[in-house]
């Protein structure tokens, strides 16, 4: 696949946040060009929407490789560690379909105990197996009730308003593959 255009329908169910559904058109061209277009506001994690293994391996080192059985057949499990000390993600597990080398799941452990799981589904589009659904779930360990008890000698600190859990679902549709996208689409505006 040299280039493609795809429509993304994004829904989010995130604790403590009201996020309206989003409709975004994504343009992609080899080797690593992306552009997003939407009529309204859209906030998308580029690395999650269009998974790029070479970019991932530039930021993480492979620590372990294993093989497992899954519902779809065989998978390779790669355990990755962050190359930099200041990385937000300390550890990644990437599960890759052994037949076509596409990621099926990515499990991420963050420095503060939170975790993120991304699950990919694929369908044939013009003879190519392309993403059809991405589900991202994030969670945090339960709050320690002992931490919430006020200490009479300390100034009270505001509790974090960060979401503790949620799900983001991205549906891919309307693919146009190898249409010869112009580089002009990717110029920053």
Predicted ranges, named:
Residues 28-30, 66-75, 125-126:
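Short, ordered beta-strand-loop transition motifs
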Residues 54-65, 113-117, 169:
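A short, amphipathic edge element
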């Amino acid at each position: 696949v040299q280039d493609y255009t795809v429509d993304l329908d994004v829904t989010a169910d995130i604790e403590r946040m009201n996020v309206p559904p989003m409709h975004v058109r994504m343009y992609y061209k080899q080797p690593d060009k992306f552009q997003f277009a939407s009529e309204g506001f859209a906030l998308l994690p580029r690395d999650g929407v269009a998974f790029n293994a070479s970019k991932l391996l530039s930021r993480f080192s492979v620590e372990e490789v294993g093989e497992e059985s899954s519902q779809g057949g065989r998978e390779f499990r790669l355990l990755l560690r962050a190359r930099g000390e200041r990385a937000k993600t300390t550890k990644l597990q990437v599960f890759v379909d052994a037949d076509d080398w596409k990621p099926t799941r990515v499990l991420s452990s963050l420095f503060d105990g939170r975790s993120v799981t991304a699950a990919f589904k694929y369908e044939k589009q013009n003879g190519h197996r392309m993403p059809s659904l991405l589900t991202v779930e994030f969670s945090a360990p339960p709050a320690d009730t002992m931490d919430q008890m006020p200490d009479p000698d300390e100034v009270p600190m505001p509790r974090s308003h960060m979401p503790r859990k949620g799900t983001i679902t991205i549906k891919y549709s309307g693919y146009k593959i190898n249409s010869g996208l112009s580089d002009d689409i990717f110029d920053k505006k």
